[in-house]
């Protein structure tokens, strides 16, 4: 995070992940301006598919120019991800950073991206669904209303910051899997 990676290093890293005991890779259309999913997809294709029992985790993303994040945008986002990753379904599909959208009702309303996310799970486009965002208070409200399988939160549960404690306690108590992203504060606590 925070620096560019050339094609060779990216492919080498992705192959090393697939060859390791790791069984999950998390990405997004917005990571590397779309290059992250594309690079992962190229390696998946070269290898003849995903390794057995490997989980691709990616995210539905808002339109970065308009900040729009309704059901239509969510549907377009999954189509872009499936094409880039060269897979026909996603192991773990998150709704990404809804706190940055123009209008929260685009997310939570009856024609919102949340309803569309769960529809994608029903359709088999995603095996499991999650919520990925930073604002723990809003995240807690949302996971209390929707039957998520997982959450991913970043920089809110570190050695110095425990803002996600209530969120993680609720998730744990309700069998919602937790991915604690950036436990070293995006590298700040590791340098």
Predicted segment positions?
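Beta/alpha (TIM)-barrel catalytic core signal, keyed to glycine-rich beta->alpha loops juxtaposed to Asp/Glu
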Residues: 98-191
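Generic structural signal for well-ordered alpha-helices
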Residues: 14, 37, 41-44, 78-82, ...
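Active-site groove signature of glycoside hydrolases
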Residues: 82-104
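A structural motif
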Residues: 22, 87-90, 126, 148
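N-terminal binding-site loop/beta-alpha segment at the start of enzyme catalytic domains
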Residues: 1-54
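Conserved, mostly hydrophobic/aromatic
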Residues: 10, 17, 25, 40, ...
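Acidic (Asp/Glu)-rich catalytic clusters
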Residues: 19, 41-55, 82-88, 142-146, ...
């Amino acid at each position: 995070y925070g620096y560019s990676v050339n094609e060779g290093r990216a492919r080498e890293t992705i192959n090393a992940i697939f060859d390791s005991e790791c069984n999950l890779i998390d990405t997004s259309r917005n990571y590397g301006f779309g290059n992250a999913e594309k690079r992962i997809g190229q390696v998946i294709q070269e290898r003849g598919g995903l390794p057995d029992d490997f989980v691709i985790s990616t995210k539905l993303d808002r339109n970065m120019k308009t900040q729009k994040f309704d059901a239509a945008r969510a549907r377009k986002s999954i189509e872009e991800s499936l094409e880039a990753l060269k897979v026909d379904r996603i192991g773990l599909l998150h709704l990404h950073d809804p706190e940055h959208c123009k209008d929260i009702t685009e997310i939570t309303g009856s024609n919102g991206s949340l309803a569309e996310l769960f529809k994608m799970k029903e359709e088999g486009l995603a095996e499991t669904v999650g919520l990925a965002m930073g604002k723990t208070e809003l995240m807690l409200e949302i996971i209390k209303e929707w039957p998520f399988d997982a959450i991913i939160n970043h920089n809110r549960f570190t050695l110095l910051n425990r803002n996600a404690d209530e969120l993680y306690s609720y998730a744990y108590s309700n069998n919602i899997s937790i991915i604690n992203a950036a436990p070293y504060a995006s590298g700040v606590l590791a340098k």
